[in-house]
């Protein structure tokens, strides 16, 4: 190494990536903490995505969102998504966090941060992570209006569903449609043992 070159610290490993699912009552996401986690002297860029609860949807006033999850599976899938992002992009550090329970209008429910030497890697990784979170993590959202409520379907998940009921994250074929209309009607299929 030349005398005028500074050593570059190694990028964080996947074991150092920050994955959090905050249980109901844990309060707001600590955005500064996640940004600080991905901060790295060798990084020339930090990209973030903050998903917030909007106050209206299709002319209806949104009061809050309510999130439920299969926690252990959601954590495993989030960690896998970060590994996939690392495999596809040259990254320094990653963080992803998602709230469960009630998230009032104006507050953040999900946050993604990625750092990289160059901005393109950080921005592309950040987009990849949030797209995969929406498409494949078992977290469900109920939108609560001032005049009712409805479970929301993720278009990203439905876009991946094939005509035989399989998805990118669930390769087992479906055998019959679920009974009744439910929140998803014919889009949900049940495998019989």
From Swiss-Prot:
Region span, Disordered = 159-193
Bias category Low complexity: which stretches?
163-178
Keywords in alphabetical order, please: Cytoplasm, Molybdenum cofactor biosynthesis, Transferase
Q: Which gene encodes it?
A: MOCS2
Which Pfam families is this protein grouped with? MoaE
Any single GO BP term: Mo-molybdopterin cofactor biosynthetic process
First-level EC class: transferase
Q: What does this protein do?
A: Catalytic subunit of the molybdopterin synthase complex, a complex that catalyzes the conversion of precursor Z into molybdopterin. Acts by mediating the incorporation of 2 sulfur atoms from thiocarboxylated MOCS2A into precursor Z to generate a dithiolene group.
Q: What is this protein called?
A: Molybdopterin synthase catalytic subunit
- What GO annotations for molecular function exist for this entry? molybdopterin synthase activity
**Annotated localization:** Cytoplasm
């Amino acid at each position: 190494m030349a005398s005028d070159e500074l050593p570059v610290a190694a990028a964080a490993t996947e074991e150092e990536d920050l994955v959090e699912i905050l249980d109901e009552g844990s309060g707001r996401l600590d955005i500064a903490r996640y940004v600080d986690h991905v901060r790295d002297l060798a990084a020339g860029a930090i990209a973030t995505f903050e998903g917030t609860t909007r106050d209206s949807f299709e002319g209806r006033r949104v009061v809050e969102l309510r999130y439920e999850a299969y926690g252990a599976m959601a954590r495993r899938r989030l960690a896998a998504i970060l590994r996939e992002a690392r495999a596809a992009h040259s990254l320094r550090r990653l963080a992803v966090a998602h709230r469960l329970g009630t998230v009032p209008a104006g507050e953040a429910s999900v946050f993604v941060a990625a750092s990289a030497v160059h901005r393109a890697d950080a921005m592309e990784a950040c987009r990849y992570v949030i797209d995969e979170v929406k498409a494949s993590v078992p977290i469900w959202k109920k939108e609560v209006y001032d005049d009712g409520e409805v479970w929301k379907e993720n278009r990203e998940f439905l876009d991946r569903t094939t005509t035989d009921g399989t998805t990118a994250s669930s390769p087992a074929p479906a055998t019959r449609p679920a009974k009744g209309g439910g929140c998803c009607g014919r889009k949900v299929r049940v495998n019989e043992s």
